[in-house]
């Protein structure tokens, strides 16, 4: 196994009530990279994220994780919370922050994810934890907003807060489902820039439809079509491929995985 391999998806297939959602999918994700899954509606992109984090069990195949420090971990068959503890976290498309808590309190809850909500609220945050929260909020441009309620944040800011809530846990992999959804061009660009900063410390796997966003930050792109890997490579190879153009890039306006 190459030293820069962090995640290996091997021969993964999924069948839902007779429908073949994924067929023999093989993907290798490199350490400290931003790896995109793209494809038209129903291609299997979000299902693949579900397989990685154990929300969905594959019909066949497996997913293996190669942490920086430690032995190979087989994620397939593990409980979702155990995968989080291994260092694989996920942010869904719709922000799920606690809107009645401040930005800082949301960060504290995420940092103490192994505790209950009320335990986390009343637990005294250490100076080291406060410093980590401040540093993380600065990375996403919310350091001056930490004392306001999350309900007061704009849509893009809520997305950045939730990304920060994942990153503060010091994961090795962050899974993102359409992080730029609902954003204007300036917010989308800023999201890309903060993800490029974050990838210095962890790997990011993204499901996305916005091709400008993909072009901005992708290190590797896996194109899915009808549950199979159509091709994989850098964004320039993907954009130049006539088959990809025919089945995906020529089908604009699609927003759902």
Give short role names for the model-derived ranges:
Residues 53:
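Helix-to-loop junction immediately C-terminal to a conserved catalytic motif
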Residues 214-216:
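A short, surface-exposed alpha-helical micro-motif characterized by mixed small hydrophobic
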Residues 38-40:
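The feature captures the beta-strand-to-loop junction immediately N-terminal to the Walker
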């Amino acid at each position: 196994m190459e030293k820069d391999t962090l995640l290996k998806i091997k021969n993964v297939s999924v069948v839902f009530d007779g429908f073949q959602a994924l067929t023999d999918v093989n993907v290798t994700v490199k350490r400290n990279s931003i790896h995109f899954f793209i494809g038209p509606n129903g291609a299997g992109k979000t299902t693949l994220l579900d397989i990685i984090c154990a929300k969905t069990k594959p019909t066949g195949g497996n997913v293996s994780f190669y942490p920086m420090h430690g032995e190979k971990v087989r994620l397939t068959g593990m409980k979702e919370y155990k995968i989080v503890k291994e260092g694989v976290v996920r942010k869904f498309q719709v922000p799920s922050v606690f809107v009645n808590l401040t930005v800082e309190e949301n960060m504290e809850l995420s940092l103490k994810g192994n505790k209950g909500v009320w335990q986390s609220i009343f637990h005294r945050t250490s100076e080291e934890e406060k410093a980590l929260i401040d540093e993380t909020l600065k990375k996403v441009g919310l350091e001056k907003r930490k004392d306001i309620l999350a309900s007061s944040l704009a849509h893009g800011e809520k997305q950045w807060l939730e990304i920060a809530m994942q990153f503060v846990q010091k994961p090795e992999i962050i899974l993102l489902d359409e992080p730029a959804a609902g954003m204007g061009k300036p917010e989308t660009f800023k999201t890309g820039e903060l993800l490029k900063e974050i990838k210095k410390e962890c790997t990011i796997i993204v499901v996305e439809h916005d091709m400008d966003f993909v072009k901005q930050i992708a290190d590797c792109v896996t194109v899915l079509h009808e549950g199979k890997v159509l091709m994989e490579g850098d964004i320039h190879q993907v954009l130049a491929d006539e088959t990809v153009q025919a089945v995906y890039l020529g089908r604009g306006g699609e927003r759902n995985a």
